[in-house]
């Protein structure tokens, strides 16, 4: 049973993941129907993002409002943090304003775990450094479950900058707990050392990873990595690891294509592949709202 906070997929049991997904499907029914509920009336959700985010922050805002909660967002660029206030003081200040749930994103791994120790409010990790992005993995797993049903024996290929991807880490933790087989592929300079210890198979070309896959997941390449020399050029990355229609034909005939967004089109994924019938990238966005509604509901009810 999910406790006070959601800090990472690594901390969750298989049963906890499935509990969240089951409720997320119920929340999606609400989204597709009446849309608005008063389930969290009187509750307050606050987002504090120390890194840029449009999708995740807006998704949490919509999730809170659809459930009838009050919502607030702290703009870090104009907040007291810029004036020297510590992270812990900021979190305590927000708690004193009677926030029930605080969603935070920070470029330093482990920040949500630290903050959770200093507040009675529930902390949701909206992404911490290169460590984890649990809500993205949950919406990805929801999308896979929706399309494929069972995870046991499912073959998933994750392609891109594995080393710097918190999305990859959270997905690997979750997919392995649910019984999927995971392959990862990317340039050797973007592959973490000893990642095999997470139970994945490492491939150094896209074709090997995609062959016979049920799910193909591209990761966003941060273009600044190329400037720092971690891979030679965008063109070379696209040639060897870009997901296109030809490579997707190596996957199973009913395979699905995923991407956490935003996509660098014609770098990680071609427009042809992203717009194809097997692409579920837009459905991931809707499922993101449903998953975050489920998490807010679970954590607020635990607080009661």
From Swiss-Prot:
GO terms for molecular function: amino acid binding; aspartate carbamoyltransferase activity. PROSITE patterns: CARBAMOYLTRANSFERASE. GO terms for biological process: 'de novo' pyrimidine nucleobase biosynthetic process; 'de novo' UMP biosynthetic process; amino acid metabolic process. Keywords: Pyrimidine biosynthesis, Transferase. The keyword 4Fe-4S does not apply. The keyword Transferase applies. InterPro entries: Asp/Orn_carbamoyltranf_P-bd, Asp/Orn_carbamoylTrfase, Asp/Orn_carbamoylTrfase_sf, Asp_carbamoyltransf, Asp_carbamoyltransf_Asp/Orn-bd. NCBIfam families: asp_carb_tr, PRK00856.1. Belongs to the aspartate/ornithine carbamoyltransferase superfamily. ATCase family. This is Aspartate carbamoyltransferase catalytic subunit. The gene is pyrB.
């Amino acid at each position: 049973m999910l406790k006070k906070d959601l800090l990472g997929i690594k901390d969750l049991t298989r049963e906890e993941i499935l509990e969240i997904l089951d409720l997320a499907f119920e929340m999606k029914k609400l989204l597709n129907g009446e849309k608005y509920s008063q389930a969290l009336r009187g509750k307050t959700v606050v987002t504090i993002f120390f890194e840029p985010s449009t999708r995740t922050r807006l998704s949490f805002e919509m999730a809170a409002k659809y459930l009838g909660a009050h919502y607030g967002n702290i703009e870090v660029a104009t907040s007291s943090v810029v004036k020297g206030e510590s992270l812990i003081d900021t979190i305590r200040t927000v708690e004193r304003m009677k926030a029930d749930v605080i969603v935070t994103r920070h470029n330093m791994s482990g920040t949500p775990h630290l903050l959770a120790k200093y507040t009675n409010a529930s902390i949701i990790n909206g992404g911490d450094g290169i460590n984890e992005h649990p809500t993205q993995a949950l919406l990805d797993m929801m999308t896979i479950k929706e399309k494929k049903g069972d995870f046991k024996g499912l073959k998933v290929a994750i392609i891109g900058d594995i080393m710097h991807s918190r999305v990859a880490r959270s997905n690997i933790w979750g997919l392995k707990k649910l019984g999927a087989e995971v392959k990862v592929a990317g340039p050797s300079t973007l592959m973490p050392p000893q990642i095999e210890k997470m139970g994945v198979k490492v491939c150094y070309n896209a074709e090997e990873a995609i062959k016979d896959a049920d799910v193909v997941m591209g990761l966003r390449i941060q273009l600044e990595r190329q400037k720092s020399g971690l891979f030679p050029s965008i063109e070379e990355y696209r040639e060897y690891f870009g997901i296109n229609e030809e490579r997707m034909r190596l996957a199973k005939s009913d395979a699905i294509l995923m991407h956490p967004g935003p996509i660098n089109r014609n770098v990680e994924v071609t427009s042809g592949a992203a717009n194809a019938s097997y692409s579920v990238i837009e459905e991931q966005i809707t499922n993101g709202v449903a998953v975050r509604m489920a998490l807010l509901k679970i954590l607020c009810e635990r607080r009661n």
